[in-house]
């Protein structure tokens, strides 16, 4: 483990939560891919039918637009989650360094007469 935390249990908890969230985002990406393929298939199938063609074409198209809109939100949330994890790790490393740096100053302050 290359990162310094107050406890390894704390690091494992942060890392576990990060991995679980990444699996959730991956599952959402997979669902988006499946829905995208289904919309394209519905669009291709609906071209062959002449009954209510406008409704049959518009429904998959609207679903596709909605899923693309949700994909942008999903990607932005995933990026912010990665940044949040990196900031948490960096804060923990800096706290450890500050603790080491301030120990010497405290000892010096006590020796002033």
Swiss-Prot record:
Protein known as: Uncharacterized protein ORF6
- TM ranges: 25-45, 49-69
Would you tell me the Gene Ontology cellular component terms?
Answer: host cell membrane; membrane
**UniProt subcellular location:** Host membrane
Q: What membrane topology term does the record carry?
A: Multi-pass membrane protein
Arranged from A to Z, the UniProt key words for this protein are: Host membrane, Membrane, Transmembrane, Transmembrane helix
Lineage top rank: taxon = Viruses
